[in-house]
A protein has these predicted regions:
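The conserved Walker
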Residues: 31, 35, 302, 331
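Conserved P-loop NTPase motor module
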Residues: 6, 104, 129-136, 147, ...
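N-terminal pre-Walker A segment at the start of P-loop NTPase domains
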Residues: 1-17
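Conserved lysine of the Walker
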Residues: 39
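Conserved ATP-driven motor cores of ASCE-family P-loop NTPases powering translocation/secretion/packaging/pilus
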Residues: 45-47, 70-90, 312-398
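Pre-Walker A adenine-sensing motif
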Residues: 13-22, 238
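P-loop NTPase motor domains
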Residues: 47-57, 64-77, 84-312, 338, ...
Length: 547
């Protein structure tokens, strides 16, 4: 809980209240412990405190339990027994509550328990407002991790994004918004690989095929619902309601079944916050607190380049007013370069059954500033549920001496809410309907499809034009061939007829016969020539028909 006297009150030890310093809340934190030791309740208590201080939070709800933060908590026997530890009360103020099994402080009870304003989100759009990002926003580095690409395939994906960016300079609609845009761009680059080889590098068909197969797997996981528009506006995570910070709860029970998609999505959110928010330095309170549950998923199978980027984002995002709190089983799940930046720590019990477990306990103990009152490593193994070793940063940013403490109980409901309650909260949200309908505007897929259609039409027209020219050429040759044959036939007929006439005339002169008239000779020449032409044309036509 939060009040002016104790600040962000999280736990209580024999020396008094243990609270997070608001100015140091953006220095990040860690909640660690074995399964069943109370990590989720601690997360809920922290989130409530930030909420009451007017700080919005984002958290992933793995089992649905965190949805209870939207409802007012109730007194229970367990809480009643622990109440005096956290809130010393004068017994004379006790009054009987008819709904309780024992006397309660009714007035105090009604003021103490309270709900938080909540918005539910869901990547799949089933249990909350949809959350989407475009392929371009996700970028090749995160997409490569998401698809599990090797170094060569990762290089090809970077080339495809670079070509898409360059093409977008010529055509602003050449955008990579959803998975079909990326698939179309991969096909396009593969088909024009030789053209781009000199400027961008080699793009092999095998690498493109591997990326296409990885895209199919992504679609099978439901990632196609995540990529697209309208893309999520991160400022919708940074709102208040009645002076309280809104708790943004991501339904992750289905999402966590795809660890790569879950961790990459949250990493994208962090990257968007880092790249979008302005520098503000240290503030009285953070602008946003980001709880990253199952944090080990973020660092599993992560390349050195991406790990460096994660470390950079975590190191620099605090100057944007954002605090990141990792939740995991053991501090050893977090790389040292990241672990060293987590100043506010709550360590629940760890079990040490194997040498590896014992080493993890020692590592966890070594991250705390020692307390001479107890041995840290032994205490970690003997903590009860709801107990933890706690160390927060002081006003100067130095870690305080570790204390064995009891975590405050949540003031909101512990456990999941009903589907009806969830639906009511979703419908009452100020952003209800903003992200519900996916928009599919013109982008790379449509542009490239249009280009392909135009090229296909142009190719068909060119082919048809060539066929027409070919037919014309063929027809011209045929006509020329017939005329040549006709001319030859006429020449032959005339020559042979003239020869015959001349021969007859010479013979008649010698024999003394009377020669036929010139007209008769001419008629004979014409008649023979005509007959020859007719026979030639007929033979040519019949020959073509037979062919």
């Amino acid at each position: 809980m939060y009040d002016k006297e104790r600040g962000l009150y999280i736990a209580h030890c024999p020396n008094g209240a243990l609270s997070i310093n608001g100015k140091m809340a953006n220095r990040h934190g860690l909640i660690a412990g074995a399964t069943g030791t109370g990590k989720t309740v601690t997360l809920q208590v922290m989130a409530e405190s930030f909420c009451q201080a007017g700080v919005p939070c984002f958290m992933a709800d793995m089992k649905g339990d965190l949805s209870g933060i939207s409802q007012v908590g109730k007194m229970s026997g367990f809480i009643e027994k622990r109440l005096p530890e956290f809130f010393p009360v004068d017994s004379s103020q006790l009054t009987v509550d008819s709904d309780a099994a024992s006397p309660q402080l009714s007035t105090f009870n009604s003021q103490l328990f309270q709900a938080c304003p909540v918005r539910f989100f869901d990547v799949y759009g089933e249990q909350g407002h949809p959350m989407r990002a475009t392929v371009s926003q996700m970028g090749p580095q995160l997409l490569s991790r998401l698809m599990g690409l090797n170094e060569t395939q990762d290089g090809v994906l970077h080339i495809v994004f670079r070509i898409a960016d360059d093409l977008a300079q010529e055509n602003p609609n050449m955008l990579l918004l959803d998975l079909k845009d990326l698939r179309a761009m991969l096909d396009y680059v593969s088909q024009h690989a030789k053209e781009y080889q000199v400027k961008y590098g080699n793009v092999s068909a095998a690498s493109v095929g591997a990326i296409q197969r990885a895209l199919l797997q992504l679609e099978a996981q439901g990632a196609d619902k995540f990529f697209g528009e309208p893309s999520f506006d991160i400022y919708d995570l940074m709102q208040t309601d009645g002076g309280k910070g809104i708790m943004n709860v991501l339904a992750a029970d289905k999402l966590m079944m795809q660890p790569k998609l879950y961790s990459t999505f949250l990493l994208w959110l962090l990257s968007e916050l880092y790249s979008t928010l302005p520098e503000v330095g240290d503030m009285e309170m953070p602008k946003l607190v980001f709880f990253f549950d199952e944090a080990h998923m973020l660092f599993t199978d992560t390349s050195k380049a991406l790990l460096d980027k994660i470390e950079q984002v975590i190191r620099l995002i605090r100057s944007k007013g954002v605090g990141i709190y990792f939740i995991t089983q053991s501090p050893t799940d977090i790389p040292e370069i990241v672990l060293g930046q987590l100043g506010n720590r709550v360590q629940h019990a760890l079990r040490a059954y194997t040498p590896k477990d014992q080493k993890a306990v020692k590592t966890a103990a070594d991250t705390f500033r020692p307390n001479p009152a107890f041995k840290t490593d032994e205490t970690i193994m003997n903590l009860e549920t709801g107990e933890a070793l706690v160390s927060f940063l002081d006003e100067k940013g130095a870690p305080t001496v570790v204390e064995r403490a009891k975590i405050l109980f949540p003031l909101s409901q512990i456990g999941a809410i009903s589907e009806g309650q969830r639906l009511d909260i979703i419908k009452q949200s100020r952003i209800y309907g903003k992200y519900d309908t996916m928009i599919d505007r013109e982008s790379a897929f449509e542009v490239l499809l249009k280009q392909m259609e135009e090229q296909a039409l142009a190719a068909a027209a060119e082919k048809e034009e060539k066929e027409v020219e070919k037919e014309k050429e063929k027809g011209g040759k045929a006509k020329k061939g017939i005329m040549s044959k006709v001319l030859k036939a006429v020449t032959t007929a005339v020559t042979s007829t003239m020869a015959a006439i001349v021969g007859t005339w010479v013979s008649d002169k010698i024999s003394g016969k009377k020669t036929k008239s010139r007209k008769s000779a001419t008629e004979k020449i014409v008649k023979n020539a005509t007959s020859s032409v007719t026979r030639t044309i007929s033979r040519d036509i019949l020959g073509n028909l037979v062919k």
